[in-house]
């Protein structure tokens, strides 16, 4: 009898403890569901696309008023990688580990190193991509402001490429919110600049996808026409062929329309394609290893335009590395950055400068050209 009473008492305590634990677990699950619901609502509420055909502010006045014919000009395209990519940096979206630059000081060092390298070519025009304005991943360093201070003699403009909501992943170090731009610098005065919104996916993934754009900057030419500089950064992550095709189709139709008016077109940037179509094979001895690095669809390039592949000394050198592992010679590299010109522009020579990827996952691409 005493044993029976003991069992009832002990069993009752166990049942009570079990109920308490169950309530705690249910409360935790409910809290997680509530947090997830709030986050989803935040993402939906925060989502917006920057308007198309957005006029951009042109700042500062350069010394030259117009471009001239038959003069050699130098233009550099440089993806700065938001100041995070030292040679040993790996990025979680590429299969690596890190989601943010390691420190504010590292960001400043990388941007300064990139600007110094670009400036060493004494360029007439500069096209920068992945220039963060106020992003968690780059410790809120205003990189466009830094570039203005580093290139004080240039006229310049900036277009927000994407302004994405806070990404709570990876959970141990969230990537955070990203406000990033493309920036164009010129030592000849700009008359205007325009931001064009590129097509992106229509699926629900667009909520956390990156908005995309290109900018069109107008520079007077001595004969009354205009030189149009297209600064481009097309989609990579999470984009299918239809989105990439739609983006390039829009870009090329715009360029062709301006060329038909007699204007001069120079388009450069990060195209997130194997630019030559076979650089992956040439540089690595194998076909494309990564889904984002598809051959550039040359069939989309309109009549009257040339993809600039006349590399200095015929050398095929990389402009980009994959960031799944720290960089060392022999790692996977590819060409994704480059230039297109209209037929009234002569591409004299192009060179993919080798930096050892010390300050970015992209090398600068330098082109010399003439207006004919």
Specify the residue positions occupied by each region the protein language model found.
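A well-ordered secondary-structure block
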Residues: 163-227, 231
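Short proline/glycine-enriched turn/loop segments at secondary-structure junctions
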Residues: 205-206, 325-330, 354-358
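Short, Lys/Arg-enriched N-terminal segments with co-localized hydrophobic residues
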Residues: 1-14
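Conserved beta strand-loop-helix elements of the APE1-like EEP
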Residues: 149-152, 176-193, 330-347, 370
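N-terminal, active-site-proximal structural segment of metallo-dependent hydrolase catalytic domains
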Residues: 11, 19-153, 158-179, 372
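Surface-exposed cleft-lining segments at the edges of enzyme active sites
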Residues: 97-103, 131-133, 198-206, 233-242
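Metal-dependent phosphoesterases centered on the DNase I-like endonuclease/exonuclease/phosphatase
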Residues: 238-344
């Amino acid at each position: 009898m005493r044993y029976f009473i003991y069992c009832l008492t002990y069993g009752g305590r166990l049942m009570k403890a079990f109920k308490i634990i169950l309530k705690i677990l249910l409360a935790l699950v409910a809290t997680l569901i509530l947090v997830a619901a709030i986050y989803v609502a935040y993402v939906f509420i925060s989502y917006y696309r920057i308007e198309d055909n957005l006029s951009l502010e042109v700042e500062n006045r350069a010394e030259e008023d117009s471009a001239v014919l038959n003069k050699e000009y130098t233009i550099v395209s440089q993806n700065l990688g938001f100041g995070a990519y030292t040679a040993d940096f790996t990025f979680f979206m590429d299969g690596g580990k890190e989601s943010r630059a390691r420190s504010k000081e590292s960001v400043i060092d990388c941007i300064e190193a990139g600007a110094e390298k670009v400036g060493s070519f004494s360029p007439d025009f500069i096209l920068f991509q992945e220039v963060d304005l106020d992003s968690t991943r780059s410790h809120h360093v205003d990189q466009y402001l830094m570039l203005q201070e580093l290139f004080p003699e240039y006229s310049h403009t900036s277009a927000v490429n994407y302004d994405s909501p806070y990404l709570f992943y990876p959970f141990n170090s969230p990537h955070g919110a990203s406000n990033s731009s493309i920036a164009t610098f010129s030592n000849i005065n700009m008359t205007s600049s325009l931001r064009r919104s590129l097509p992106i996916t229509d699926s629900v993934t667009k909520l956390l996808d990156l908005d995309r754009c290109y900018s069109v900057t107008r520079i007077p030419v001595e004969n009354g026409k205009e030189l149009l500089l297209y600064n481009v950064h097309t989609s990579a992550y999470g984009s299918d062929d239809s989105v990439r095709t739609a983006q390039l189709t829009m870009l090329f139709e715009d360029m062709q329309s301006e060329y038909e008016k007699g204007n001069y077109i120079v388009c450069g940037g990060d195209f997130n394609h194997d630019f030559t179509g076979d650089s992956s094979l040439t540089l690595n001895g194998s076909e494309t290893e990564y889904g984002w690095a598809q051959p550039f669809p040359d069939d989309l390039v309109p009549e009257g335009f040339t993809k600039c592949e006349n590399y200095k000394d015929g050398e095929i050198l990389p402009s980009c590395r994959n960031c799944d592992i720290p960089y060392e010679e022999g790692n996977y590299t590819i060409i994704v950055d480059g230039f297109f010109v209209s037929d009234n522009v002569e591409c004299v020579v192009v060179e993919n400068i080798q930096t050892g990827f010390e300050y970015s996952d992209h090398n600068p691409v330098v082109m010399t050209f003439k207006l004919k």
